[in-house]
């Protein structure tokens, strides 16, 4: 079996087909930064709790943190190769692990994952997580999260 390698395909992947104006870039970065700050806090908390023989959760939190750092680099333009976005698992973690136990963290990961999906799909226009057409209940959900988690909401 012969696999043909096309440098054009690689070049297309290295230059995303989406465009992001400066305002959208800043908003996307704000979503990712909020998720990253909370991920770093959760990672530190879990690492402090887990003993040396009990390291089951730390890798998951580290993975989420690394994916968010990579996404930030893609949004800022520091990272041109968007191929790794195809391998992101943080959205799955948000649903399976955090939706019930840590809704604020799940929300932050969902927002960052949504932005990553927009980039991965090479959308010509990036829709933000608070887009009223895509998520009409966004602001009500945010008000509920802020009421439940006032000390971490603006982290």
Regions found by a protein language model. Give the residues of each.
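Short terminal alpha-helical segments
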Residues: 2-59, 142-144, 149-152
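Detector for Asparagine
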Residues: 9, 31-34, 66, 130, ...
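Amphipathic alpha-helical binding modules
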Residues: 87-155
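Non-membrane alpha-helical secondary structure
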Residues: 20, 24-27, 31, 56, ...
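Amphipathic alpha-helical interaction modules
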Residues: 41-97
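Charged, amphipathic alpha-helical oligomerization/scaffolding segments
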Residues: 23, 27-41, 63, 67-70, ...
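Hydrophobic transmembrane signal anchors and adjacent membrane-proximal interface regions, especially
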Residues: 1-8, 69, 126-128
């Amino acid at each position: 079996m012969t696999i043909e390698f096309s440098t054009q395909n690689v070049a297309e992947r290295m230059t995303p087909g989406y465009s992001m104006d400066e305002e959208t870039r800043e908003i996307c970065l704000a979503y990712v930064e909020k998720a990253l700050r909370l991920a770093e806090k959760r990672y530190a908390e879990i690492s402090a709790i887990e003993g040396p023989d009990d390291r089951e959760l730390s890798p998951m939190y580290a993975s989420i943190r690394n994916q968010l750092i990579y996404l930030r680099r893609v949004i800022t333009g520091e990272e041109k190769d968007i191929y790794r976005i195809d391998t992101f698992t943080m959205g799955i973690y948000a649903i399976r692990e955090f939706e019930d136990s840590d809704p604020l963290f799940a929300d932050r990961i969902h927002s960052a994952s949504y932005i990553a999906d927009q980039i991965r799909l090479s959308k010509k226009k990036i829709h933000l997580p608070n887009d009223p057409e895509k998520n009409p209940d966004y602001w009500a959900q945010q008000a509920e999260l802020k009421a439940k988690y006032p000390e971490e909401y603006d982290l």
